[in-house]
C-alpha cells in the first residue's frame, strides 16, 4: 500500500517542496529550509499543511458518554465551539495517543470532532466503534480523515492574516475555541489552537476546498514543512506521539509525560483506576539544555554528573531560535527539578546539561 497524500500534495510539488514519510503519509519536510521556515513562524507567520492528522466525528445521543470514556479530560465541560487537549489511554493508564477534542459548533457536522495523530485514525476509529458496540451506546463514529484537509497558520501575524480573509470574528476566538467561518468561499472550522507556542489558528475544511484555502493564505506567508513544525514544538516542549511516548516502545502515563492537567479522574475514562496512584511518577518529562558542544538525540542516555544513568532523551535539536542544543526526555523524579545539573551521553562521552523547564524561549 502506497503512502497517503494530502489534498494539497499537488500544490506542494508545484512549490518545490522536499517530502518525507511520516505516519504513512508523504508530507512536505520543507519548502525553503527549516531555519527560514522556523524563523518566519517566530517572527511573522507560516502556514503548515497538517492534513496528515486524523479527524474522527462522533455524534448521537450517547456521543458525550463515548468521548468521556475514551479520552482523559472532561468533555462535559465543553460548550459547542469549545475544545480541549486530552490523552487516550489503555486499561493500564498508558498513553496510546494524545488528541484535541472539539465539541463542534451547531453549524458543523457531528457533535464531537477529535484529532488523532498521523497514522492513528484507523486505530482510533476501531477503538471507538469497538467500545461503542461493547457497551451498547447509541452513537455514530465516522473516520472523515480523507474527507477533510487541515492547515495551521502560526506566528505573531497569523491572527491578522487569517482575519483579513475570514473576518474579525477570528480575533474573538479565545484559546481552545472554534467557530465555523468562511475562508475563500469555503466553509471551515477555525480554531484558536496550535503546536508552535505562537499565536495562530488551525483550520479544517472539506478536501475539495483545500486549494482555495491554501492559496488564499499561503500566497502571503511562508509555507512550512514538518521539519520546522518539529523544531518549533520542541522549543515549546510539546509532546510528539511515537517519539516522546509510545505504548510499545516507550510506554508512559499522562503524569509521567507532564500532562496531568489533561486528566479528569471524575470523568471515568478507561485507565482511570490504573492511574489513581500514579500522580507522583518515578520519572518525569523534562527539558534539557546542553552546556557543551553536541546535540541530544532520541535514545541518548541522561546521567548524573557521576555517570549513573537516570533517564533517556526522546527528542533533541539545535534550537534555531536560541542557537543552542536543547532536548526533551525523561529522568528520575529525584533529578527533575529545574536547574539540576545532569549529563547527556553522546557517543560514549558525557556532556554536561541542565534540566530546563520548557518552554525554552522567553515569551
From Swiss-Prot:
Molecular function, one GO term: transaminase activity
E.C. number: 2.1.2.10
Keyword Transferase included in the entry's annotation: yes
Gene3D superfamilies per UniProt: Probable tRNA modification gtpase trme, domain 1 (3.30.1360.120)
Keywords from the UniProt entry: Aminotransferase, Transferase
Pfam family, one: GCV_T
Entry GO CC: glycine cleavage complex
Alphabetical list of SUPFAM superfamilies matching this protein: Aminomethyltransferase beta-barrel domain (SSF101790), Folate-binding domain (SSF103025)
BP-aspect Gene Ontology terms: glycine decarboxylation via glycine cleavage system
Family: Belongs to the GcvT family.
Cited function: The glycine cleavage system catalyzes the degradation of glycine.
Quaternary structure note: The glycine cleavage system is composed of four proteins: P, T, L and H.
Name of the molecule in the record: Probable aminomethyltransferase
Organism this protein belongs to: Halobacterium salinarum (strain ATCC 700922 / JCM 11081 / NRC-1)
Amino acid at each position: 500500500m502506497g503512502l497517503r497524500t494530502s489534498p494539497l500534495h499537488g500544490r506542494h510539488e508545484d512549490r518545490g517542496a522536499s517530502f518525507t514519510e511520516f505516519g504513512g503519509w508523504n508530507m512536505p519536510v520543507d519548502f525553503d529550509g527549516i531555519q527560514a521556515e522556523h524563523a518566519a513562524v517566530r517572527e511573522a507567520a507560516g502556514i503548515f499543511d497538517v492534513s496528515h492528522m486524523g479527524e474522527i466525528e462522533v455524534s448521537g445521543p450517547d456521543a458525550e458518554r463515548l468521548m468521556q470514556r475514551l479520552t482523559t479530560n472532561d468533555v462535559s465541560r465543553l460548550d459547542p465551539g469549545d475544545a480541549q487537549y486530552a490523552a487516550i489511554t489503555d486499561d493500564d493508564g498508558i498513553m496510546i495517543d494524545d488528541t484535541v477534542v472539539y465539541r463542534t459548533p451547531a453549524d458543523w457536522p457531528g457533535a464531537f470532532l477529535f484529532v488523532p495523530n498521523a497514522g492513528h485514525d484507523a486505530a482510533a476509529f476501531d477503538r471507538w466503534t469497538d467500545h461503542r458496540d461493547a457497551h451498547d451506546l447509541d452513537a455514530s463514529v465516522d473516520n472523515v480523515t480523507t474527507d477533510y484537509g487541515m492547515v495551521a497558520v502560526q506566528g505573531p501575524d497569523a491572527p491578522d492574516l487569517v482575519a483579513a480573509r475570514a473576518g474579525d470574528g477570528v480575533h474573538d476566538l479565545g484559546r481552545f475555541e472554534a467557530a465555523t467561518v468562511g475562508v475563500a468561499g469555503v466553509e471551515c472550522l477555525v480554531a484558536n489552537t496550535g503546536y508552535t507556542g505562537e499565536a495562530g489558528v488551525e483550520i479544517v475544511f472539506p478536501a475539495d476546498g483545500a486549494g482555495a484555502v491554501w492559496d488564499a493564505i499561503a500566497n502571503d506567508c511562508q509555507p512550512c514543512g514538518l521539519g520546522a513544525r518539529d523544531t518549533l514544538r520542541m522549543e515549546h516542549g510539546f509532546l510528539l506521539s511515537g517519539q516522546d511516548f509510545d505504548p510499545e516502545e516507550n510506554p508512559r502515563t499522562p503524569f509521567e509525560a507532564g500532562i496531568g492537567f489533561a486528566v479528569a479522574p471524575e470523568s471515568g475514562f478507561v485507565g482511570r483506576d490504573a492511574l489513581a496512584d500514579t500522580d507522583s511518577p518515578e520519572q518525569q518529562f523534562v527539558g534539557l539544555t546542553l552546556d557543551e558542544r553536541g546535540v541530544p538525540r532520541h535514545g541518548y542516555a541522561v546521567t548524573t554528573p557521576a555517570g549513573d544513568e537516570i533517564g533517556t532523551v526522546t527528542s533533541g535539536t539545535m534550537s534555531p531560535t536560541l542557537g543552542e542544543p536543547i532536548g526533551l526526555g525523561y529522568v528520575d523524579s529525584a533529578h527533575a527539578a529545574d536547574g539540576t545539573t545532569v549529563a547527556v551521553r553522546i557517543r560514549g562521552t558525557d556532556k554536561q546539561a541542565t534540566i530546563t523547564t520548557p518552554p525554552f524561549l522567553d515569551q
